[in-house]
Amino acid sequence: MSMACTKVWRSTMYTPRRLKRTTPASRVSSTAMAAANGDASHGANGGIQIQSKEMKTAIHSNDSPKTLLKSESLHEYMLNTMVYPRENEFMRELRLITSEHTYGFMSSPPEEGQLLSLLLNLTGAKNTIEVGVFTGCSVLATALAIPDDGKVVAIDVSREYFDLGLPVIKKAGVAHKVDFREGAAMPILDNLLANEENEGKFDFAFVDADKGNYGEYHERLLRLVRAGGVLAYDNTLWGGSVALEDDSVLEEFDQDIRRSIVAFNAKIAGDPRVEAVQLPVSDGITLCRRLV
């Protein structure tokens, strides 16, 4: 098999396997579905590998950690040294529940939740927005970090998966901080903007939803988040595939997402309204501070 493999890119990214989808994508009702789908494995040497021209690769699955680190042992070291020992008991409970789910790979990994919590505390955020919720791991991280009178407006096209995590959020004593809104994100954001009092009301926004709409979400969130506030966008390196010159080796699903992410990255890179940084945490996270 190794003789048939063609290495098309070498870097700190997943080494995906041939796709083995058993559930139609249409059955995944959460907006977080667009974050990932497929069957991937993490290779020691990094890079996307394909077995033949007929075999397509997929970026994410439950079979591999959502990380861009080339070394799995290094990722484990980081988790065991800095993440798990400091993990809130309710965050751990929800993480373990989510990991057993068929689409558990769509969840924000614990190191990303830790980063979000730190950012929220550093910025003193009180009112936040989250687009794309899934089981609520990042919502819980946010609710635990913001003050008792803070709010996270959590938006997802379906509450099916959120209901899996809601009992843990309630047990953590932070359910009163969560304002879950079911439906497509665009009209919900537009409805928020219809009330002028919401412009500049929010301190922080986190987006982990349909990648094709990231640019549109950005325009709306720039009006909802105050000057000096932070906007965070997940999956902006998409398994490292953004660096591919030829994405024909990818599943069509991943090709579409890759192209959307590449366009979004270019948009942020040239946006004078924000100060931005892209970090290789998890699957890539882009942080923007609104300047004007």
Curated annotation (Swiss-Prot):
Q: This protein's superkingdom? A: Eukaryota
In residue numbers, the region (Disordered) covers 21-46
Its required cofactor(s), as named, are: Mg(2+); Mn(2+)
Cross-referenced InterPro entries = Cation-dep_OMT, SAM-dependent_MTases_sf, SAM_O-MeTrfase
Annotated CDD domains: AdoMet_MTases
Cite the entry's keywords alphabetically: Magnesium, Metal-binding, Methyltransferase, S-adenosyl-L-methionine, Transferase
**Tissue expression per record:** Expressed in stems only.
Where along this sequence does the record place binding of S-adenosyl-L-methionine? S108, E130, G132, V133, S138, D156, A185, D210
Matching Gene3D superfamilies, A to Z? Vaccinia Virus protein VP39 (3.40.50.150)
Cofactor binding: number and manner: Binds 1 divalent metal cation per subunit. Fully active with Mg(2+) and active at 70% with Mn(2+). Active at 40% with Co(2+) ion and less than 10% with Ca(2+) or Zn(2+) ions.
Q: In what ranges is there compositional bias, type Polar residues?
A: 23-32
Single Gene Ontology BP annotation: methylation
Q: Which reaction does it catalyse?
A: tricetin + 2 S-adenosyl-L-methionine = 3',5'-di-O-methyltricetin + 2 S-adenosyl-L-homocysteine + 2 H(+)
Q: What does this protein do?
A: Catalyzes the stepwise methylation of tricetin to its 3'-mono- and 3',5'-dimethyl ethers. No 3',4',5'-trimethylated ester derivatives are produced. Can use caffeoyl CoA, 5-hydroxyferulic acid, luteolin, tricetin, quercetin, myrcetin and 7,8-dihydroxyflavone as substrates, but not naringenin, apigenin or kaempferol. The 2,3-double bond and the O-dihydroxyl group of the substrate are both required for catalytic activity of the enzyme.
Family named by the database record = Belongs to the class I-like SAM-binding methyltransferase superfamily. Cation-dependent O-methyltransferase family. CCoAMT subfamily.
Protein name, UniProt field: Tricin synthase 2
